[in-house]
Amino acid sequence: MKDHTESFKKKSLLSRLKMPIAELEDYYRRKRHFDRNKEIRHIALRRAYSKLFIPLLSMDRALHKKKYRIIGDRRIQTKNPKIYACTHVGSTDISVVYEALKDHCYWFWGDIGEYYRKIDGLLVFLNGAVLIDTRDKQDRRNARNTAVKVLQKGGNLLIFPEGAWNITESTPVMHLYTGAVEMAIESGADLIPVGIELYGNTFYINIGRNISSRNMQPDSKQKYTEKLRGAMAALK
């Protein structure tokens, strides 16, 4: 990996179009580090855009003959920002659960290679996304800090804290990283567990009750991460 602290020079669109994907990923990884102190802007505009984006997701789902059913929704109305912590069953669950939630969220998105030079990437960018190269420690730190700033500005976050697809039947929820709880503590966000199952072409989505971060302490992040994991497992 290149040193993120080296000087960064923005490149023209034409130059970026000519870059190989690996080089383009490195360019944007360094750009995210360069921009790490920038203010989060245009959340209201992105929220308005999501009213158009979600119907597009519905159309795409219908074209691929996918369905979803909400089998429970125990969300409590709140003025606090929200972190939707979802179980992860495959590559398309993020778009389906976002459609089902009907609540504007920034996507905490780790599929960097799929983001560039595709219309999907542009649409997600307009909606709002926190990109992360999970292989890179500095980029993980930058993504976490950016997500906290989004939440502090009143935005919501959609995240898969398992960090990988869970296709095992014996483990309802895999090990969770503590990042979701850490971000909730720093921003005052509510954690909302979401269980997702896929049978055939139908997603079954169960939305749990808010978990307040008000009384959480940083030194108890592992305890509350286990509480979140238990809540997610109970929804499957």
Please give the residue ranges for each predicted region:
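Helix-to-loop junction immediately C-terminal to a conserved catalytic motif
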Residues: 50-88
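Structural motif corresponding to alpha-helix initiation and N-cap regions
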Residues: 70, 117, 141-144
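Non-catalytic C-terminal accessory region of glycerolipid acyltransferases
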Residues: 2-33, 37, 141-236
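Helix-enriched interaction subdomains in cytosolic or periplasmic regions
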Residues: 34-56
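Residue-level detector of flexible, active-site-proximal loop/helix-junction positions
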Residues: 74-77, 113-115, 136, 198-200, ...
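A structural micro-motif
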Residues: 68, 104-106, 127, 155, ...
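Catalytic core of membrane glycerolipid acyltransferases/transacylases, capturing the structured
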Residues: 78-137
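Structural signal for hydrophobic
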Residues: 70, 123-124, 191, 207
